[in-house]
A protein has these predicted regions:
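Alpha/beta-hydrolase superfamily serine-hydrolase fold, recognizing
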Residues: 15-307
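Bacterial Sec-dependent N-terminal signal peptides
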Residues: 1-21
Length: 307
């Protein structure tokens, strides 16, 4: 009886934060299948020496633990690492949604990490940014374990995760975006950004952000304009921004601010690349035939930057 009560209490603790489960691969498939009847949910091909370790705790505060899934080749050492951030409008989604993409990129000679971070029902901006930057430090601190070269780190995100990836990459070692409670010998600096259909500016002529952005940014633009500005990668892009790849769908609003950021990168002679997948929907990376192109564009870019 005592064991049962302890088990139940642990379950209550584990669910003491809000979870929005509305954004899933299957729900996205159901929305798209009528317009795109040829699509198939993407499946991964596992390399013979590839290893997956799930639910590694990278940070814990009181009863709340944050996890990551690690994917790496046990025969190869000092691989470039790819930190992966799922989408879901900053309020839904989970790290499992990055597993197929992680496995595919791992099979090409990289170590990949799918990150759990706190979403807007649980924590407002910039807490999720702190979480991913803490995960980067954790990966660097454990570089030998994960077969990682700590000086070759890319951050990749999809949709809202793409927005976060761009913000993380454009705020390298900016103390405003560092969690002072997290103790590490490593920095959160990254050397490359892959933004997959994520906006670069919240308030922009091309942007159409509304309720979900307001929930994450703790208010509408009129209520909290500073957060809307500070959370925009375009606001931070400068001569220190790392090489950047933009992979986009055919929907323009999901790359709001991209062309302005490219102008800054070009002005500073920073390598950047744009790949648009024609006639594709948002969330194209979940499905074939588009996952294959996503992997191809990502790995060719990473090879150019790191190898």
């Amino acid at each position: 009886m005592l064991f049962f009560l302890w088990f139940v209490s642990q379950g209550i603790i584990a669910q003491s934060y809000s979870v929005d489960t509305s954004y899933t691969v299957m729900s996205t498939y159901d929305k798209l299948i009528k317009k795109y009847p040829f699509i198939k949910i993407a499946q991964a091909t596992k390399g013979v020496n590839d290893v997956k370790i799930e639910n590694i705790v990278y940070y814990k505060e009181k009863d709340r633990a944050l996890h990551l899934d690690a994917f790496f080749n046990k025969k190869q050492k000092n691989n470039p690492a790819v930190i992966m951030i799922h989408g879901g409008g900053w309020r839904s989604g989970n790290k499992n949604q990055m597993q197929v993409l992680a496995k595919e990129i791992t099979s090409k000679g990289y170590s990949c990490f799918a990150i759990e971070y706190r979403l807007s029902p649980e924590a407002k901006y910039p807490q999720g940014i702190y979480d991913v930057k803490n995960a980067i430090k954790f990966v660097k601190d454990n570089a030998k374990r994960f077969h990682v070269d700590p000086d070759k780190i890319a951050v990749l995100g999809c949709s809202s995760g793409g927005q976060m990836a761009a913000l993380i990459g454009t705020t390298n070692e900016d103390l405003i975006f560092e969690d002072t409670k997290y103790k590490s010998k490593s920095s959160s600096r990254v050397q490359a950004i892959i933004d997959i259909d994520g906006i670069l500016a919240f308030k922009h002529p091309e942007s159409a952000e509304g309720e979900m952005a307001s929930l994450w940014l703790d208010g509408t633009y009129e209520q909290n304009p500073e957060n809307w500005k500070q959370a925009s990668a375009l606001h931070h892009a400068n001569e220190n921004t790392p090489p950047t790849l933009f992979i986009n769908s055919s929907f323009e609003r999901f790359h709001a601010g991209r062309d302005d950021m490219i102008a800054i990168l070009n002005q500073n002679k920073i390598y950047n690349q744009v790949e648009t997948i024609p006639y594709s929907p948002h969330s194209f990376w979940f499905f074939q035939p588009w996952l294959e192109k996503t992997v191809e564009y990502s790995t060719k870019f990473l090879e150019r930057v790191f190898k």
